[in-house]
Curated annotation (Swiss-Prot):
Annotated InterPro entries: ATPase_YchF/OLA1, Beta-grasp_dom_sf, G_OBG, GTP-bd, P-loop_NTPase, TGS, TGS-like, TGS-like_dom_sf
Needed co-factor(s): Mg(2+)
Entry keyword set: ATP-binding, Magnesium, Metal-binding, Nucleotide-binding
Record's keyword annotation contains Metal-binding: yes
Job description of the protein: ATPase that binds to both the 70S ribosome and the 50S ribosomal subunit in a nucleotide-independent manner.
SUPFAM superfamilies: P-loop containing nucleoside triphosphate hydrolases, TGS-like
Protein name: Ribosome-binding ATPase YchF
Protein family (similarity comment): Belongs to the TRAFAC class OBG-HflX-like GTPase superfamily. OBG GTPase family. YchF/OLA1 subfamily.
GO molecular function: ATP binding; ATP hydrolysis activity; GTP binding; metal ion binding; ribosomal large subunit binding
Nucleotide-binding listed as a keyword: yes
Binding site for Mg(2+): 15, 35
Lineage: Bacteria, Bacillati, Mycoplasmatota, Mycoplasmoidales, Mycoplasmoidaceae
Amino acid sequence: MLSAGIVGLPNVGKSTLFSAITNLQVEIANYPFATIEPNAGIVNVIDERLDKLASLIKPDKVTHTTFRFVDIAGLVKGASKGEGLGNQFLANIREVDLICHVVRCYEDKKIVHVNNQVDPVFDFEIIVNELIQADIEVVNTRIGKIKRKAESGDKQSKEEYQLLAPVLQGLQQNQMVLHLVNEVDLKKLKSLNLLTAKPILVVANVSEADLSNLDHNPHLTQLNQFLKQHNLPHAIPVCALLENELSSLDANGRQDWLKELGLSDYQGLNQLIKTAYDAIGLWSFFTFGKQEVRAWAFKKGWLAPQCAGEIHTDFERGFIKVEVISWNQLYELKSLQEAKKQGLVRLRGQGLRDARWWCVSL
């Protein structure tokens, strides 16, 4: 299962956020390194399309697709050199597919900040710099192994060296690998498992009071300006403390409480989970029947047989054709039989690619 790692400096709200995401009470304390071993949790990816299909079909069971989050203990400056148990933390980050940077965007004198000041840009740069330094070491080591072969004329080593040399130069100028190479070259670098080649999301941990008017949070404004300058998506505003309190409620209870607080439009964790799911390259297709309506995750670019293999390996091996219909057409017509009458149910073969939001009757 693909996963996202939650990283950040100590005491920015990482573990509180993780607790809310998974509704799992992990160790939370107001001091650095309260979390040493990474905690992992599986979350549902809420999809309104699936819920609408379920309301139409009324199955015995509704199953959302899932996604894995990992809470990785707090990094500090010097982690790439092993400071603050940094080697262990960096090793944990290597195991995830997406990095969620949590930065603090609220003032609270009761909660000690590791740098004694609230500066989300500075916090973000510290973490990224540690990841860059770790990548420099990996690339340097690899270049050292292939340079002699490349200079002697070995074609494969020469091509790899020509790819790595500018990457190393860019890293030394504090640029992330993500912004140094195209998608084709990024795949060639996959075996090195470079940290700054992973997709990045930034989570701005704000106070509950800020949620009603985020434009008036100077820390968030500063952070988003910085991210825009560096071709990174805007931060996702989340109040980790509020989310932790809401996590014990069902969807209706959550919405009622937010409405009472005047925060009906607040998406918070749902936005984070959906954005992470998409950023990691995952899409969904749906299966439906009276017993179950279910969402299935698949990687962008997959063909129909690979998607079928998510349901059962036999389906992938024996795949020939499948009847599909788009979810919105099925929902609008309220009936699979009516959709067939109108010729909207299509028979597709092995060449069907990226079956996003297609529905398959089981």
